[in-house]
């Protein structure tokens, strides 16, 4: 998973950050500068990986980055994020990854504790062999004293009931001039 690979890379920058009290790093710049009409690259130059998709819709790595790099030099706000969704076929067993600023993270499935995760790279907590069961998957983070500092939950979605498309347009409306774009 891309988000997990990025956490491992970002941790190296986070661990080695100078403690000057000033922002010394962007936490990893997420921009690529290039001339898209050079060397026959064209539109294929746009990256398919990263923290957002081409329409700037956030991916898991975006939220992992927010947990890790939410302050200046040190983390200022505690936060927790479960990587991925909780919608799987019956009998699925998989690892669950949680990004957290806490010292410990406990995972709950439908209010039943699944135990505490294995900590890696200071922010990444792994829960191996979690059996899928429809409902609410919740991660609760604790500080050194065992006090809850943050939580995050994902839930299984039900069957779709319908689809509603809503346009967002500029004040002048849509124009069939070849310049407007509708994403569906």
Per-region residue spans from a language model:
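Non-catalytic terminal accessory/regulatory regions of metabolic enzymes
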Residues: 138, 150-152, 171
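Surface-exposed, proline-enriched loop/turn segments that connect beta strands in immunoglobulin-like
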Residues: 82-85, 165-171
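Edge beta-strands of extracellular beta-sandwich domains
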Residues: 145-158
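Beta-strand-rich structural segments
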Residues: 98, 177-184
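Extended substrate-binding grooves/exosites of carbohydrate-active enzymes
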Residues: 1-121, 125-148
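Short, solvent-exposed loop/linker segments at the N-terminal edge
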Residues: 86-92, 171-180
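Short beta-turn/strand-loop junction motif enriched in small, turn-promoting residues
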Residues: 15-16, 170-172
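Proline-centered linker/hinge motifs at extracellular inter-domain junctions
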Residues: 161-163
């Amino acid at each position: 998973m891309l988000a997990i690979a990025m956490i491992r890379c970002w941790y190296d920058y986070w661990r080695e950050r100078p403690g000057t009290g000033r922002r010394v790093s962007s936490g990893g710049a997420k921009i690529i500068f290039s001339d898209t009409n050079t060397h026959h690259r064209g539109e294929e130059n746009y990256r398919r990986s990263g923290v957002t998709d081409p329409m700037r819709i956030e991916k898991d790595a975006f939220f992992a980055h927010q947990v890790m790099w939410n302050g200046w030099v040190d983390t200022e706000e505690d936060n927790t994020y479960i990587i991925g969704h909780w919608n799987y076929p019956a009998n699925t067993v998989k690892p669950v990854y949680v990004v957290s600023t806490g010292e410990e993270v406990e995972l709950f499935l439908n209010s039943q504790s699944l135990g505490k995760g294995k900590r890696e790279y200071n922010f990444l907590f792994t829960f191996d062999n979690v059996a899928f069961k429809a409902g609410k998957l919740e991660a609760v983070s604790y500080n050194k004293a065992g006090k809850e500092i943050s939580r995050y939950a994902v839930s299984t979605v039900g069957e779709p009931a319908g689809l509603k498309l809503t346009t967002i347009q500029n004040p002048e409306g849509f124009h069939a001039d070849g310049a407007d774009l509708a994403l569906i």
